[in-house]
Amino acid sequence: MALKSLAIVAAAILWAATAQAHSHKFKTLEIVHPWCIETEDAAKPVVVSMTIRNTGSKPDRLLRVSAPNTAKTELRAGGPPDAEGNAIASVPVERKSEVNLKRGGPYILLTGMKKPLGAYDSFPMTLTFERAGKIEVEVTVEETSALEPLKQ
């Protein structure tokens, strides 16, 4: 009995570590841990966060984002998700550097979700870059408790 409990705990820890550290590599770009927070209401805007690493010798730009489960996707300069006028045309990713897309900085905003997002769900998203082209990623939906408080 104790061995079975230990195996269950070990599997849960391994699953949690894997879920927290997933990444997608394509050419010179690595997309690290794309995630968002669960929602109870499909009408609520969703902020998607991730880190984009460019290991190449040339800069790139995130030009577009698409997801099949949403009516609209936007690249945002910052500010609250419900603010108007924060859309930007692209996010630069300089050579040999990384960009953190998250609340308080540039981020991805999804609106018009087809259904609420439950914790531990995931959904596909396509990121289109100027040089690297299209990169398919899987966005993990995390519990609300994963959201770090913003420093105002």
What are these regions (language model features)?
Residues M1-A7:
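Bacterial N-terminal signal peptides that target proteins for export
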Residues H22-Q152:
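Compact, glycine-rich, soluble single-domain proteins
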Residues A16-T18:
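N-terminal signal peptide c-region/cleavage motif recognized by signal peptidases
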